[in-house]
C-alpha cells in the first residue's frame, strides 16, 4: 500500500472472508463497550516517511492491492478506525513487515472518505484522533493488534500557557518568512485559545522539516512539558533555517535587481549618447577597428581590393544577422595578417655563434649552416626564406635548435606538429562556406607572430597521415616550394599570402616515410645520437645546472661526480638523445630536495650538502636498467657482429648461424628474427654468393652438405630491415663453415652484391656511436662511405681501427686473419 508517506503494498493476498471475520470479532468487542469508547483492536498501517499527529486531517494515497481491500471493508463497517505506525527503518520492505519492525507508538485514525482514482488506486481522507501504543499483536498477517490509547491531561497551568504563547510567537515568525502554509496557519491561530497546548505542539511540529526520528520522538513523548520543550527546539531550528533561506533569496534577488538596473541604465546611456552623437553603432566600431589595423600595414593592392569590397558589404548587413558575423570574422582575419611587417635582420656572426654554443653542445653542422644563412643575408642585404629539415633520433635537440635559430635571427618562433594530421584544411584552411571555418596553421602563425618572416617549425613531418579529407603532405608541397610559396593561397582567406620570407624548419626521425616530392624541397641536416663523452658534456654544462635551477637547488646543495653521470648514462639512459638522461637527473634532484626539506624541519640551522657518486646513484634511481650491449665478450663460431641504425639511433646487430641435419637431404637456409623483405633478400644474396665463391674462401670443403643452416638475428620482437647486413651474414656463414670464430671486437656494415662487391650504406655516425658503446674497436665500412667517415669529429674516431673495403675479399682477410 502506498501513501503520501511512501508506504508500499504488502504481499498479503487477502481472503475477504478472513478479513470480514476479523472485522466481525472487532464489532462484537465494540458492542460490549460504550458507544464513545474507541476500538481496542486496530488494523495497523505501516508508514515509511513521517508519522502523523493527533488533531489533523490527512490524505493518504492507496494503490490497488490488499490494503485497499482492507480499508474498503473497514470503511463499510461500523468500526472505520485504523492505526498508523512508523517503521523503524525508512527503507523497510513493507511487503513483508512484522511488528518487530514497527515503532510501538503511533496514532489512531478514522476513515472519513475513500475516493477512487484512475488506475485502481484511491485517495483516503483520514481524521487523526489519538496517540496509541501497541500492546499485543492479535493477527500478524494483517498486522492487527490490541492497542492502548493515551488521553491528554487537559489541566492548563500558567507555565503551559506561557509555552503555548512561545510556540505561537515562533509560528508567526515562520509565517512571515515562509508563506507555504500561510492559510492553514492563519486558520489554526484564529481558532487557537491556548487551552490545548499539547495539540498546539503536535500541530507545530508537524509543519517542520524535522527528521522522521525527531518527529517520532515527539510523538512518543506523553509528558506535556517535555513534548512542548522538544517542539520548541524543532521550531527554533526551523526558524533558523527559514531565516537562512530568506537571506539567500534576498541576496539572489538583490543581484538580479542590480543586474537589471545596470542593464537599463546602460541602454539609457547608449540611447542618450546616440542622440548626442557620442556613440557609434556596431558598424562604425568594427570598421574603425579594421581601418586602424590597415593604417599600420602595407597591404598589397589585390588584398586591399578584397578588404574594401567586404567592408562595403559589411555596412549593408544587419548586425544581428548571421551573415554579418561571417563577414566581420573574415575581415578580422584579413586585416590581422601582418602585411608588409618584418623583423629587422641582425647579421652579427660572433653573437650568433655565442648564442648557439651557449644553448647547444656539438651540432657543428647545424651551427655552420645557420652562420652561412646569416652571412648570405648580410651580403645580399636581405635573407630569403629557407627550408631546413632536421633529421635525428628523439631527444637530440631538434626542436630546441629551432628555437635557438629564431633567437639568433631575432625572429618570432611558431611551432606546430603534423604528426598524425590527416586533414589538409589544417594546413590550407577551411572554405568560408563551412560553419566554424578558420584559416590554416600557416596564417595562424603569421597572426600570432605578427610578422611576415617568422621561424615556423613543422614538427614530426615523417608521421604525417592522409585520409579521405585530403593529403596534408601534398598540401605542404606548395608551402615548401620557394617558387610557389610567395603566392600561397589559404582556402579561408582566398587571398595570396607571401611566405617566401619565412624560415621553415622541419623535424623528422627518419626520411623513409617522407614522400619524395616533399623531401626534394628540403635541405636535410642530420642530427645523430650522442656518444658518452658528448652526453657527459651536455649533462655537465646544460642539464644539471638547468635542473638545479628548476628545483630551487644550487651547487652548494648538490653536485654530481663525473663518474656518477657516466654511470647514469651507461646504465639508465642509453638512448641516442638526452631526454631520458634529463629525466633521471631531475629524478635524483627531486629526491635530494625532499631530503633537504626533511633535514631542515628536523634541524633548521644545519645546512645539507649531497654529492652524487656511482655508489649512491642506485639509492636514487633504483637498479640499473641496462647491462652491456655485447652478447658475447668473445665471439663464438658462427656469430658475426653487424652495425645498424634506426630512428632511435645506432645499435649492434648480431648474426648467429648454426647447422642441423636437413630432413630433405639438401643444403637449405632458414632465417628468423623478424627480418624485413630487404633483409631476407640480403640473406639469400649472402647464401648464393658464398656458394658461388666457396673455393676461394674454403677450398675442399663441401657447402653445408645435407645440412639446414639456421640464421637468426637476436631480439626477435624488434622488426629489422635494410641491406647493410649483407657482409655480416656472409661472415657468419663462413665462420660456421670454416669452424673458425670471427676476429674479436670486430664490427662491420655494408651491402653485398651477388658478385661480392660492397656498396655504401647510411648512418655511419650512428653506427660508429653504437660500436664505441659496445667497445668494438675494429670496424669495416664500405669504401663509398670514406668521405662520410672523414667528416666526423676526431673524438668520435679516436681509438678505432677502421678498414674501408670494396669487395668481400677484403672483409675475409680482416675477419679471419689466421685463415
From Swiss-Prot:
GO terms for molecular function: ATP binding; ATP hydrolysis activity; ATP-dependent peptidase activity; sequence-specific DNA binding; serine-type endopeptidase activity. Residues 18-38 have a biased composition (Basic and acidic residues). Its main location: cytoplasm. The active site is at residues 724, 767. Residues 1-14 have a biased composition (Polar residues). Gene3D superfamilies: 1.10.8.60, 1.20.5.5270, 1.20.58.1480, 3.30.230.10, LON domain-like, P-loop containing nucleotide triphosphate hydrolases. Keywords: ATP-binding, Cytoplasm, Hydrolase, Nucleotide-binding, Protease, Serine protease, Stress response. It is found in: Cytoplasm. SUPFAM superfamilies: P-loop containing nucleoside triphosphate hydrolases, PUA domain-like, Ribosomal protein S5 domain 2-like. Induction: By heat shock. Its EC number is 3.4.21.53. It holds the Pfam family Lon_C. The keyword Nucleotide-binding applies. Residues 42-239 form the Lon N-terminal domain. It catalyses: Hydrolysis of proteins in presence of ATP. GO terms for cellular component: cytoplasm. Residues 634-818 form the Lon proteolytic domain. Residues 1-41 are annotated as: Disordered. ATP-dependent serine protease that mediates the selective degradation of mutant and abnormal proteins as well as certain short-lived regulatory proteins. Required for cellular homeostasis and for survival from DNA damage and developmental changes induced by stress. Degrades polypeptides processively to yield small peptide fragments that are 5 to 10 amino acids long. Binds to DNA in a double-stranded, site-specific manner. Belongs to the peptidase S16 family. Homohexamer. Organized in a ring with a central cavity. PANTHER family: LON PROTEASE, LON PROTEASE HOMOLOG, MITOCHONDRIAL. This is Lon protease.
Amino acid at each position: 500500500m502506498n501513501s503520501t508517506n511512501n508506504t508500499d503494498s504488502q504481499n498479503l493476498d487477502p481472503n475477504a472472508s478472513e478479513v470480514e471475520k476479523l472485522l466481525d470479532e472487532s464489532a462484537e468487542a465494540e458492542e460490549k463497550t460504550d458507544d464513545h469508547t474507541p476500538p481496542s483492536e486496530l488494523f495497523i498501517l505501516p508508514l515509511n516517511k513521517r508519522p502523523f499527529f493527533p488533531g489533523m486531517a490527512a490524505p493518504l494515497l492507496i494503490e490497488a492491492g490488499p490494503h485497499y481491500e482492507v480499508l474498503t471493508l473497514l470503511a463499510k463497517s461500523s468500526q472505520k478506525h485504523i492505526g498508523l505506525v512508523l517503521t523503524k527503518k525508512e527503507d523497510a520492505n513493507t511487503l513483508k513487515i512484522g511488528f518487530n519492525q514497527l515503532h510501538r507508538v503511533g496514532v489512531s485514525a478514522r476513515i472519513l472518505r475513500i475516493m477512487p482514482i484512475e488506475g485502481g488506486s484511491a485517495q483516503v481522507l483520514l481524521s487523526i484522533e489519538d496517540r496509541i501504543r501497541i500492546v499485543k499483536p492479535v493477527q500478524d498477517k494483517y498486522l492487527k493488534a490490541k492497542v492502548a490509547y493515551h488521553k491528554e491531561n487537559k489541566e492548563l497551568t500558567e507555565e503551559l500557557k506561557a509555552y503555548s504563547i512561545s510556540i505561537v510567537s515562533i509560528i508567526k515568525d515562520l509565517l512571515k518568512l515562509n508563506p507555504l502554509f500561510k492559510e492553514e496557519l492563519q486558520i489554526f491561530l484564529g481558532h487557537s485559545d491556548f487551552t490545548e497546548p499539547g495539540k498546539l505542539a503536535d500541530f507545530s511540529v508537524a509543519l517542520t522539516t524535522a527528521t522522521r526520528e525527531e518527529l517520532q520522538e515527539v510523538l512518543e513523548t506523553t509528558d506535556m512539558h517535555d513534548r512542548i520543550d522538544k517542539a520548541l527546539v524543532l521550531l527554533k531550528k526551523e526558524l533558523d533555517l527559514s531565516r537562512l533561506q530568506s537571506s539567500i533569496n534576498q541576496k539572489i534577488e538583490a543581484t538580479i535587481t542590480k543586474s537589471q538596473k545596470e542593464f537599463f541604465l546602460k541602454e539609457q546611456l547608449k540611447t542618450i549618447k546616440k542622440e548626442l552623437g557620442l556613440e557609434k553603432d556596431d558598424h562604425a566600431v568594427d570598421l574603425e577597428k579594421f581601418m586602424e589595423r590597415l593604417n599600420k600595414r602595407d597591404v598589397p593592392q589585390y588584398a586591399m581590393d578584397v578588404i574594401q569590397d567586404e567592408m562595403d558589404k559589411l555596412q549593408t548587413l544587419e548586425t544581428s544577422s548571421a551573415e554579418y558575423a561571417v563577414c566581420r570574422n573574415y575581415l578580422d582575419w584579413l586585416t590581422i595578417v601582418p602585411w608588409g611587417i618584418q623583423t629587422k635582420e641582425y647579421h652579427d656572426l660572433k653573437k650568433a655563434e655565442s648564442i648557439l654554443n651557449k644553448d647547444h653542445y656539438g651540432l657543428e653542422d647545424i651551427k655552420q649552416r645557420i652562420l652561412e644563412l646569416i652571412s648570405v643575408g648580410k651580403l645580399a642585404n636581405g635573407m630569403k626564406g629557407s627550408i631546413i629539415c632536421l633529421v635525428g633520433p628523439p631527444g637530440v635537440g631538434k626542436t630546441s635548435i629551432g628555437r635557438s635559430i629564431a633567437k639568433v635571427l631575432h625572429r618570432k618562433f611558431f611551432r606546430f606538429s603534423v604528426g598524425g594530421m590527416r586533414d589538409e584544411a589544417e594546413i590550407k584552411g577551411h572554405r568560408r562556406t563551412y560553419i566554424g571555418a578558420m584559416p590554416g596553421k600557416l596564417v595562424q602563425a603569421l597572426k600570432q607572430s605578427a610578422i611576415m618572416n617568422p621561424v615556423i617549425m613543422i614538427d614530426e613531418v615523417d608521421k604525417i597521415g592522409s585520409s579521405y579529407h585530403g593529403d596534408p603532405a601534398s598540401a605542404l608541397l606548395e608551402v615548401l616550394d620557394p617558387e610557389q610559396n610567395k603566392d600561397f593561397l589559404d582556402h579561408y582567406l582566398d587571398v595570396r599570402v607571401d611566405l617566401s620570407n619565412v624560415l621553415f624548419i622541419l623535424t623528422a626521425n627518419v626520411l623513409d616515410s617522407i614522400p619524395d616530392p616533399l623531401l626534394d624541397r628540403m635541405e636535410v641536416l642530420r642530427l645523430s645520437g650522442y656518444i658518452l663523452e658528448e652526453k657527459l658534456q651536455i649533462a655537465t654544462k646544460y642539464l644539471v645546472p638547468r635542473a638545479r635551477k628548476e628545483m630551487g637547488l644550487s651547487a652548494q646543495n648538490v653536485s654530481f661526480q663525473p663518474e656518477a653521470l657516466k654511470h647514469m648514462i651507461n646504465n639508465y639512459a642509453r638512448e641516442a638523445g638526452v631526454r631520458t638522461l634529463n629525466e633521471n637527473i631531475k629524478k635524483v634532484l627531486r629526491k635530494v630536495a625532499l631530503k633537504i626539506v626533511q633535514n631542515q624541519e628536523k634541524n633548521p640551522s644545519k645546512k645539507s650538502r649531497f654529492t652524487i657518486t656511482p655508489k649512491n646513484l642506485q639509492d636514487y634511481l633504483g637498479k640499473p636498467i641496462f647491462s652491456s650491449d655485447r652478447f658475447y665478450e668473445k665471439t663464438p663460431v658462427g656469430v658475426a657482429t653487424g652495425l645498424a641504425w634506426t630512428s632511435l639511433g645506432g645499435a649492434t646487430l648480431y648474426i648467429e648461424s648454426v647447422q642441423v641435419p636437413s630432413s630433405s637431404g639438401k643444403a637449405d637456409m632458414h632465417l628468423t628474427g623478424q627480418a624485413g623483405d630487404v633483409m631476407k633478400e640480403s640473406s639469400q644474396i649472402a647464401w648464393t654468393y658464398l656458394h658461388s665463391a666457396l673455393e676461394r674462401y674454403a677450398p675442399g670443403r663441401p657447402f653445408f652438405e645435407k645440412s639446414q643452416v639456421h640464421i637468426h638475428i637476436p631480439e626477435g620482437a624488434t622488426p629489422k630491415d635494410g641491406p647493410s647486413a649483407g657482409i655480416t651474414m656472409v661472415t657468419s656463414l663462413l665462420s660456421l663453415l670454416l669452424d673458425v670464430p670471427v676476429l674479436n671486437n670486430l664490427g662491420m656494415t655494408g651491402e653485398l652484391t651477388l658478385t661480392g662487391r660492397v656498396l655504401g650504406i647510411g648512418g655511419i655516425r650512428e653506427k660508429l656511436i653504437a660500436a664505441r658503446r659496445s667497445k668494438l674497436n675494429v670496424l669495416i665500412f664500405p669504401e663509398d662511405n670514406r668521405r662520410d667517415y672523414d667528416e666526423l669529429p676526431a673524438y668520435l674516431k679516436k681509438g678505432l681501427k677502421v678498414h674501408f673495403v670494396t669487395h668481400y675479399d677484403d672483409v675475409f682477410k680482416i675477419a679471419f686473419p689466421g685463415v
